């Protein structure tokens, strides 16, 4: 039997079945198939020992995500020298207690953090095709994800207060320092460029000359932020936000980044050039999704253990 336009019903049914199976895999398996990415970055002074940095990003915690909570808790077993949290911790305003429980063991380590839009505001239902439409139109998310009228305001202050109480440094449009095994590591952070909360003018001026390493930290890797950090001479920039593309095509990669960063650098370690300088850039694919699109394909959720080593 043939359906309209001469397409056999068996073919139509087969395509539908494959699509359904893919959706089940993307939501039921891959979105919960947590991985640890390991990278080495040569940015430390000569003669220093390696430093282990755990980057956690885009947790997007939803109530009831027991497997994610257990996996995040297990990361403390890596015994990092410090933790960097690059934001978007929530996708459910009622999940703050579970988020803090999941991150509890990591809060025992030194750390720094910035927030993303989903820390401040609850997610809104959005047609996933809009990401592709914005890319085709050349907007690439440049208008940001400014909260719509009626958006849920998260109790983000509870997260901030818990992080601060643990000793983590709040890098919201400001600077901070950690001392790690005798090394002075300076950080400069920005609030989320995706909703235009970044204020680079407050922190401009380049790395601190008496620090052994200076690191730029931001949630969304918009080019204006990457350009500013790099042109000022920061050797390392850490970001999240992109979800690695979230729905990728095998052997091709990501279709979108949800910002103006190119898809070749949607996740992992790369470089960025601006103002005559080159910086190492690490973009985390994150370990969560929006509660309204709880799927990943060819892009498993992850955290990253960065081993910082002496420069060549």
What is each residue range found by the language model?
Residues 42-54, 168-169, 175-187, 213, ...:
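Beta-strand-turn-beta hairpins that frame and shape the catalytic cleft
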Residues 50-69, 90-92, 121-132, 251-262, ...:
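Acidic/histidine-rich helix-loop elements
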Residues 1-15:
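Membrane-penetrating hydrophobic segments
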Residues 67-179:
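Core catalytic region of metal-dependent phosphoesterases/phosphodiesterases
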Residues 54-57, 82-88, 111-117, 171-173, ...:
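Active-site neighborhood of phospho(di)ester-bond hydrolases with catalytic His/Asp-centered motifs
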Residues 12-14, 18-102:
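N-terminal active-site segment of His-dependent metallophosphoesterases
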Residues 61-66, 90-94, 118-125, 146-147, ...:
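Active-site environment of divalent metal-dependent phosphoester hydrolases
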